[in-house]
């Protein structure tokens, strides 16, 4: 099995969502997890211990394993992410331009039929999930 398949099969059974992962050229495997209510250090330790054993059995080659929360500016990858974070601000970069524009910053209105709706400057734009190159939450800090 490949790393993504292992993570997608293992993490939900432990009560966590796979947000993203990366394997660096230096061999560091970074796994970003989330769950309702957020991630604690204990969660990271639990997942690290479990995945270390699974990767040993599956003979996955890596040097270091890092488990982390996705952070306040977490990536948005699936339709469920856009539904969950509706009402919050996001930055979306598209693969193909929409009305001559590829970068959008605005409020997520929702996601239906694999189409994300985002509003900004009094306009509303619909973006197909297949046209999204990168999307991240843009947290607001009020002082």
Swiss-Prot record:
GO terms for biological process: ribosomal small subunit assembly; translation. Pfam families: DUF150_C, RimP_N. One of its GO terms (cellular component) is cytosol. Keywords: Cytoplasm, Ribosome biogenesis. Its main location: cytoplasm. InterPro entries: Ribosome_maturation_RimP, RimP_C, RimP_C_sf, RimP_N, RimP_N_sf. It is found in: Cytoplasm. Belongs to the RimP family. Required for maturation of 30S ribosomal subunits. This is Ribosome maturation factor RimP.
């Amino acid at each position: 099995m490949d790393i993504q398949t292992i993570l997608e099969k293992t993490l939900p059974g432990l009560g966590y969502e796979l947000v993203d992962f990366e394997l660096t050229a230096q061999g560091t495997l970074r796994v970003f997890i989330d769950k309702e209510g957020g991630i604690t250090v204990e969660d990271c330790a639990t997942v690290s211990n479990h995945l270390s054993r699974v990767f040993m059995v599956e003979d996955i080659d890596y040097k270091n394993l890092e488990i982390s929360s996705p952070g306040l500016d977490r990536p948005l990858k699936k339709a469920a992410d856009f539904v969950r974070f509706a009402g919050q601000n996001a930055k979306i970069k598209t693969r193909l331009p929409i009305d001559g524009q590829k970068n959008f910053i605005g409020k997520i209105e929702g996601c239906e039929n694999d189409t994300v709706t985002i509003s900004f400057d009094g306009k509303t734009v619909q973006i197909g999930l297949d046209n999204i190159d990168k999307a991240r939450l843009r947290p607001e800090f009020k002082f």
